[in-house]
Amino acid sequence: MNSSYKSRVFNIISIIMVSMLILSLGAFANNNKAKADSHSKQLEINVKSDKVPQKVKDLAQQQFAGYAKALDKQSNAKTGKYELGEAFKIYKFNGEEDNSYYYPVIKDGKIVYTLTLSPKNKDDLNKSKEDMNYSVKISNFIAKDLDQIKDKNSNITVLTDEKGFYFEEDGKVRLVKATPLPGNVKEKESAKTVSSKLKQELKNTVTPTKVEENEAIQEDQVQYENTLKNFKIREQQFDNSWCAGFSMAALLNATKNTDTYNAHDIMRTLYPEVSEQDLPNCSTFPNQMIEYGKSQGRDIHYQEGVPSYEQVDQLTKDNVGIMILAQSVSQNPNDPHLGHALAVVGNAKINDQEKLIYWNPWDTELSIQDADSSLLHLSFNRDYNWYGSMIGY
């Protein structure tokens, strides 16, 4: 083999290798461009500050996947690859913010849940963000609304008032979740404006929070889950004061394995002389809760405070229903929902930590939160203190 032939072979091989390198670099560049394009279309949520307490970040990362798996199990949904977006905040139109942090939980590319980290107990409300203890809760709160605009290159601010929750984008305000307040008529959204103070504070933020997938932590484990076997959500509370009626109906339907109970019939039984027009304004008092339970063959008793995890576990195994009695921390005397009732559905152990599963009659799905938290951060941005329980339904 002469030297000129060797030289030609070497040149051909060199050309092939250079061509392959160019192609691979091109593919890498295209892949990066695709990723960049994908991220450029990600939803961004405006925040005053992108600083999140480290304990909040750690709790969210440690627990989100286990919570999502547990809630998926309750709705018989298949598990998937769970990822956590970045934290965002919710503001009033005047710029005030609440004391909670919200994370979108993403499964297989879709926002399916919202992870909420809020003060654990009433005493924590007076502590700084860095010093307070946080409770972790998961629900479907505004998750579907966020998912609908996740890939539309949107930049929004999440806002709230007594009417509900809103997305503001390019100066336009859109109601996405109405609160169950009597006479809650949807106002013209165009009339709502964000305060100049909040606009400036949001503008000063270095970067908005991005609703994008982060690397999932897959070792989260749901070691145990125990719920009332026949519990189903059949109705939802709207513009009325029947929270206890809804909760009692749901618990009795579950423990008796029937579908004969509903909130309206229970309230009509308790208030036979009240007109249909005035019935939505009727509330339920503790003695009525006990007497109605007894009329249905149940031995109901009141217990102060939050029942222990072990007690909830045993009562649920025994097919005994527990109703939560809670009071709004704000103590506004004009609040039609100053008191609230919810139904305990069961308990779970996630990553060796004890959790309670409950149903808020305002919601269409269940929620899960820490078993040692007496503070309930409910679906229209208010904190309720769990002060007692009615046991025996």
From Swiss-Prot:
Record-level GO cellular component terms: extracellular region
The protein's predominant localisation is: secreted
What post-translational changes are documented for it? Proteolytically cleaved by staphylococcal serine protease (SspA).
Localization annotation: Secreted
Instruction: Please state how the activity of this protein is regulated.
Output: Prematurely activated/folded staphopain B is inhibited by staphostatin B (SspC), which is probably required to protect staphylococcal cytoplasmic proteins from degradation by SspB.
Q: Does the keyword Heme apply?
A: no
**Pfam families registered for this protein in UniProt:** Peptidase_C47, Staphopain_pro
Which domain of life does this protein belong to?
Bacteria
Locate the active site: 243, 340, 360
Q: Which GO terms describe its molecular function?
A: cysteine-type peptidase activity
Is Protease one of the keywords UniProt gives this record?
A: yes
List its EC numbers. 3.4.22.-
| Propeptide stretches in the record | 37-219
Report the enzyme's class at the first EC level. Answer: hydrolase
* Swiss-Prot/TrEMBL site (Cleavage) positions: 219-220
PROSITE patterns, per this entry? THIOL_PROTEASE_HIS
For this UniProt entry, which residues form the secretion signal? 1-36
GO BP annotations, alphabetical order: proteolysis
Q: Which UniProt keywords are present, listed alphabetically?
A: Hydrolase, Protease, Secreted, Signal, Thiol protease, Virulence, Zymogen
Q: How does it assemble?
A: In the cytoplasm, prematurely activated/folded SspB forms a stable non-covalent complex with SspC.
Miscellaneous comment as given in the Swiss-Prot or TrEMBL entry: The cascade of activation of extracellular proteases proceeds from the metalloprotease aureolysin (aur), through SspA to SspB.
Purpose of the protein: Cysteine protease that plays an important role in the inhibition of host innate immune response. Degrades host elastin, fibrogen, fibronectin and kininogen. Blocks phagocytosis of opsonised S.aureus by neutrophils and monocytes by inducing their death in a proteolytic activity-dependent manner. Decreases surface expression of the 'don't eat me' signal CD31 on neutrophils. Cleaves host galectin-3/LGALS3, thereby inhibiting the neutrophil-activating ability of the lectin.
Instruction: Identify its protein family.
Output: Belongs to the peptidase C47 family.
Name of the protein in its database record: Staphopain B
Record organism: Staphylococcus aureus (strain MSSA476)
